[in-house]
Amino acid sequence: MKNKLPPFIEIYRALIATPSISATEEALDQSNADLITLLADWFKDLGFNVEVQPVPGTRNKFNMLASTGQGAGGLLLAGHTDTVPFDDGRWTRDPFTLTEHDGKLYGLGTADMKGFFAFILDALRDVDVTKLAKPLYILATADEETSMAGARYFAETTALRPDCAIIGEPTSLQPVRAHKGHISNAIRIQGQSGHSSDPARGVNAIELMHDAIGHILQLRDKLKERYHYEAFTVPYPTLNLGHIHGGDASNRICACCELHMDIRPLPGMTLNELNGLLNDALAPVSERWPGRLTVDELHPPIPGYECPPNHQLVEVVEKLLGAKTEVVNYCTEAPFIQTLCPTLVLGPGSINQAHQPDEYLETRFIKPTRELITQVIHHFCWH
């Protein structure tokens, strides 16, 4: 029952005190099972039906869906349960102890983004869920900070089709309706080693990579010329060469060279389209040197995302906040939730605090966030 729910600050404190770090390095990676159990128990106390979904391909990670109300449509409030690892030497406070000081709540996940669930639970104290005309769903996902496996799997497997969704990432309560995607690849070239005194007896992978880079830079120019979205600060897809390694000695013909690169596509560009453009760009090298060039994903790709600017969700939220929706360059789970329904990214705290030592959320966000959650529930679930 509602009177069993702890006070807002104690909910917040318990969430921060429950570690749920996501990391590609197995030694740092943690299950989110304890955090999911916390959330599930609280939502059950509020009368929600709760489903816990194991996420395949992860190290004991789970999604949670809490639901109440009947019928079609309704509202989905979503967020991720995991945090990034922390640099112990750069934190001046215990990352897992919620600390309030000078108008700020400090702790790992205060802004990005465990705190959003505390706001939802607190707002629901004043909502009679038995009187909702449409369903209300709360989604807590796993592994957003690494593979986004939780949101991907939920979107692939659910039959839910809400009217709209809000993902509570830290946007300083400024609504976001679009962002770029992210694709990161490793270009690997396998040459043939040999003594540098006889170049004809080897195939220098660095020289082949030099040729490949020239074609990749031509692709970068093509992306800049062909695709535009003026609302973005950088209004075209970017392509970055971020890391390269090859060879082991100055007197040996380089046998292997590897380049890491990324592309940040605009909304509307498909992953198949981008893969085709990259493969076409590298085709001259592949054709000249069959079997020596490969392209592999470094991370699962994230498509760009856009909520239609004239959708009711945009109009309602802009009116409630008195602020226009924005577009941003960072990535969220929105592309996957958007496959289910129109989606906005909107939550308390600043994105500038995400992944930072001494992460905090300013207490000035508490009242307006609680009010906003109550208002959107009333608008989309009561009418």
Curated annotation (Swiss-Prot):
Protein name: Acetylornithine deacetylase
Binding site for Zn(2+) 1: 80, 112, 169
Catalysed conversion reaction: N(2)-acetyl-L-ornithine + H2O = L-ornithine + acetate
Disulfide bonds: none
Location relative to the cell: Cytoplasm
Gene: argE
Native species: Escherichia coli (strain SMS-3-5 / SECEC)
InterPro entries: AcOrn-deacetyl, ArgE/DapE_CS, Bact_exopeptidase_dim_dom, Peptidase_M20, Peptidase_M20_dimer, Peptidase_M20A
Complex formation: Homodimer.
Phylogenetic classification of the source organism: Bacteria, Pseudomonadati, Pseudomonadota, Gammaproteobacteria, Enterobacterales
GO biological process: L-arginine biosynthetic process
Protein role: Catalyzes the hydrolysis of the amide bond of N(2)-acetylated L-amino acids. Cleaves the acetyl group from N-acetyl-L-ornithine to form L-ornithine, an intermediate in L-arginine biosynthesis pathway, and a branchpoint in the synthesis of polyamines.
Pathway connected to this protein: Amino-acid biosynthesis; L-arginine biosynthesis; L-ornithine from N(2)-acetyl-L-ornithine (linear): step 1/1
Keywords, in A-Z order: Amino-acid biosynthesis, Arginine biosynthesis, Cobalt, Cytoplasm, Hydrolase, Metal-binding, Zinc
GO molecular function, one term: acetylornithine deacetylase activity
